[in-house]
Amino acid sequence: SNQKLISTAFALDRLGPDFRLRTQLVQQADGTLELKGQGDPDLGIAGLQRFAMAAMGQGGARGASAGFVNLKVQEEPRQNWWPNDWHPADRAYAYGAPITRLALTSNALGGAVSDPYRRLETLFKKEVKRRGGSIQVQQVQPISNSQQSQQSDDSILLHEETSAPMHALLSLAN
């Protein structure tokens, strides 16, 4: 609990109380879609449904049918989801939910979601299928800020969900 207070103060100081986290669906120049997030703990199923709708409207690659989506999901590798010194038993509880870029419902459903990437992938696939499409999903490493500045940005923002302001999100953690 003490560590959360320090983290909260640091976040407020560096980002400000009105900062909002973004989750984005972008189309790359080659037509591939990418889902990338900043760790919004309040991203929910309704937001995921809106991302699926946006993906279905664009398709996934040049020449692909409107019902096919080729999606790359930028997510941290599993070994980064928890601090190294956390006891594995703590990971089952809601307070031990993994820290990810694309958390759905705070990565907790009563207890912690043990594999949030698989949960997101499964729910996204179900939503695309429900809408009559098909999807190929691939997990990729997030691009660092230095790598991002070196790339040409020919991507097109298709949909964005923004979090509540930082001051409201902090009440979820404390």
Residue ranges and their predicted role:
Residues 2-11:
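Active/ligand-binding-proximal structured segments within catalytic/core domains
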Residues 13-174:
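Conserved serine DD-peptidase/penicillin-binding transpeptidase domain
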